[in-house]
Regions:
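N-terminal targeting signals for export/organelle localization
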Residues: 2-88
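Structural microenvironment flanking redox-active thiols in thiol-disulfide oxidoreductases
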Residues: 113-159, 169-173
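Structural micro-motif
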Residues: 159-161, 178-190
Length: 224
């Protein structure tokens, strides 16, 4: 009979493994971009992350699905997710967009947990979370990372919103938010209103640019 009990040390080791794996994936993406550029180093973005520049540089080359446009119905989805406190993996626990009707939804696609630019982004959303809440909006982060990584990252940064796991990237593809050649999401943000209609789209959201957050907030204020 297998012993199914786990110590806190076991979970800490799993968390360390997840963080190390995410870092290796980001490093691999950076190296791939350098190789494509003839060995030239990838320039850093304002967030200070060379990997973030890799994602930005790849946007033009990524195969583009038809992105949902402002005024169109947002594609529905149902995905497992994690919060800092709990994993939601069973089919009847997963989050669907349809279940969120009646709330404005900020859907933030990002490349990878633990990377520099993505940490800047989610922590900025964390710090403005109460402000968005007053506008009847909830934030959903979404990447291809597993829920186990999501939960460790959410705990580490005390994130107050869910992180969805789109491991096969089918949702990211439906929202033109996936880079096929790197296997990561683009950094994009959608604002979806209470009726499930797209009201704002930014397919080149910048994690460290205050203007992008301000423009999102301005659109959200119109929906009060």
């Amino acid at each position: 009979m297998l012993n199914r009990t786990h110590s806190q040390g076991d979970f800490n080791r799993v968390g360390a493994f997840v963080r190390a794996g995410a870092a290796l994936l980001v490093l691999a993406a950076t190296c791939a971009a350098q190789s494509a550029a003839g060995g030239q180093p990838v320039s850093k973005t304002s967030s200070g992350s060379g990997a973030a520049a890799t994602y930005a540089d790849a946007k033009a080359a990524a195969p583009a699905a038809a992105a949902p446009k402002v005024g169109e119905a947002a594609p529905d989805f149902k995905l497992p997710y994690a919060t800092a406190e709990k994993l939601f993996m069973k089919p009847d626990e997963q989050m669907s967009l349809a279940s969120l009707k009646g709330k404005n939804v900020i859907l933030a696609f990002y490349p990878a947990d633990w990377s520099g630019g993505c940490t800047t982004e989610v922590c900025t959303f964390r710090d403005t979370f109460m402000e968005f809440g007053k506008l009847n909006a909830m934030v959903l982060g979404i990447s291809g990372d597993y829920v186990f990584s999501h939960q460790e990252w959410a705990k580490h940064h005390k994130l107050p919103f869910p992180l969805l796991s789109d491991h096969d990237h089918r949702v990211a593809k439906a929202y033109d938010s996936y880079m096929e050649q790197y296997g990561f999401n683009k950094r994009t943000v959608y604002l979806i209103d209470k009726e499930g209609v797209v009201r704002y789209v930014n397919l080149a959201f910048k994690a460290g640019d205050k203007k992008d957050y301000d423009s999102l907030r301005a659109e959200l204020e119109k929906l009060k």
